[in-house]
Amino acid sequence: MSSCFCSKSQETEKRGAVSEDQLVISDDSTHPANLICELCKVFYNNGWVTGTGGGISIREGSKIYIAPSGVQKERMVPDNMFVMDLESENYLRTPLTLKPSACTPLFLSAYKMRDAGACIHTHSQAAVMVTLLYDKVFEISSIEQIKAIPKVTEKGNLMYSDRLVIPIIENTEREEDLTDSLQQAIEEYPGTTAVLVRRHGIYVWGETVWKAKVYNEAIDYLLELALKMHQLGIPTVKQN
């Protein structure tokens, strides 16, 4: 007669499988796994994450949710998500058929060095083009949209007449090899909420996913504006 009881190891495996799914399946539209899918579609429609490029991660307490590598952003579903414990950097959930995002160590840098709540990586054409025109930093001032960007080192946002400074780091053959340069830029520019990568794109983070989204949109607007100003011979930093 066959037994109706499972071994302890089998029970553990079943419980683990269920708990892994519970990490990403929710009817709550604000759940990180659902938000990542929603935002990936928005970024795809904006032309920022074509051809599976780019990435996004959202932090919820000690857990971080990360969009996978190799999945078309407009087709992303919650079941595609990786989930990691921030402190141990161990995966709590790994989709069997997908690869972790190569952006993960850079996301971790934003979480641990800036206590970010979310980090966005896009391949925005404006971001790429600006890095071909500027050397070590991108600078712009006296544009109203600058007021959407935080001061970071003190309370409040930048003012109209303030100068926005975003460091530019050199690209590498592999995404994860950008980690040291990004960390160095974060240390050297404590007031920045973004880092540009030459001929590649941009990383933007914020206290919450919504703030990161606002910063990303505002910065991309400013980058596009800077390109048009350059074409017309207008300095991006207003001269007194």
UniProtKB/Swiss-Prot annotation:
It catalyses: 5-(methylsulfanyl)-D-ribulose 1-phosphate = 5-methylsulfanyl-2,3-dioxopentyl phosphate + H2O. InterPro entries: Aldolase_II/adducin_N, Aldolase_II/adducin_N_sf, MethylthioRu-1-P_deHdtase_MtnB, Salvage_MtnB_euk. The active site is at residue 144. It comes from the Eukaryota. SMART domains: Aldolase_II. It is an enzyme of class 4 (lyase). It comes from Komagataella phaffii (strain GS115 / ATCC 20864). Keywords: Amino-acid biosynthesis, Cytoplasm, Lyase, Metal-binding, Methionine biosynthesis, Zinc. This is Methylthioribulose-1-phosphate dehydratase. The gene is MDE1. It holds the Pfam family Aldolase_II.
